[in-house]
Regions:
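All-alpha helical catalytic cores of prenyl diphosphate-utilizing isoprenoid enzymes
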Residues: 13, 28-32, 97, 113-162
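Short glycine/serine- and small hydrophobic-enriched flexible loop segments
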Residues: 40-44, 107-112
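Short alpha-helical functional segments enriched in proximate histidine and acidic residues
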Residues: 65, 109, 131
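Conserved N-terminal diphosphate/IPP-binding helix and adjacent helical/loop segment
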Residues: 1-63, 69, 73-88, 127, ...
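Short alpha-helical transmembrane interface motifs in multi-pass membrane proteins
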Residues: 24, 91-92, 154
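Multi-pass membrane catalytic core of lipid/isoprenoid biosynthesis enzymes
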Residues: 88-108
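Residue-level signal for inorganic ion chemistry
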Residues: 38, 106, 135
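Catalytic-loop motifs flanking and including active-site residues across diverse enzymes
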Residues: 34-35, 58, 95-102, 160-161
């Protein structure tokens, strides 16, 4: 199963277009798709079925890209994956709203996880989300600090990448 094709199959042709076009633009930009690939590989290691892990794998990628939209706004980044960032191509409000919608869409995708696995998946997903937010806050905090230790920096990176 090609995770990139599965991501591109997600339907973003909805109204209001100003909310969903930036999501489609973001996900169509590609990327390594490391998180969903790792989810698929881990599942296969334990004889899991691709169709059972696919909703969680897709949710991971949508969530990851949501964090990138918000990170680009916070960092005032102009480019991402060789293309203008959403807040540059559209505007900051659109980037924030589209990012927020991606978060919601990630949870909607998780609803496709088999019922017996869903509580644990949600627990892990929420832990990941919390760690990413904590790491991002450290990143913001470090911008105003004179010095950051290597240990602090590594902690920030570990949390941001969860």
């Amino acid at each position: 199963m090609d995770i990139n094709n599965e991501i591109l199959k997600l339907d973003w042709k909805r109204e209001p277009y100003g909310l969903y076009e930036p999501i489609e633009y973001t996900l169509a930009a590609g990327g390594k798709r490391v998180r969903p690939q790792l989810a698929m590989i881990a599942s296969r290691m334990f004889d899991g079925k691709d169709e059972e892990v696919l909703p969680a794998a897709l949710a991971l990628e949508v969530f990851h890209n949501f964090t990138l939209l918000h990170d680009d706004v916070m960092d005032k980044a102009d480019m991402r994956r060789g293309r203008p960032t959403v807040h540059v191509k559209w505007n900051e409000n659109t980037a924030i709203l589209s990012g927020d919608q991606m978060l919601i869409e990630a949870y909607k995708l998780l609803s496709g996880v088999p019922a017996d696995k869903l509580p644990r998946v949600l627990q892990l997903f929420n832990q990941m989300a919390t760690e990413i937010c904590e790491g991002q806050q450290y990143d913001v905090d470090f911008e105003s600090q004179e010095q950051v230790t290597i240990e602090e920096y590594l902690k920030m990176i570990r949390l941001k990448t969860s």
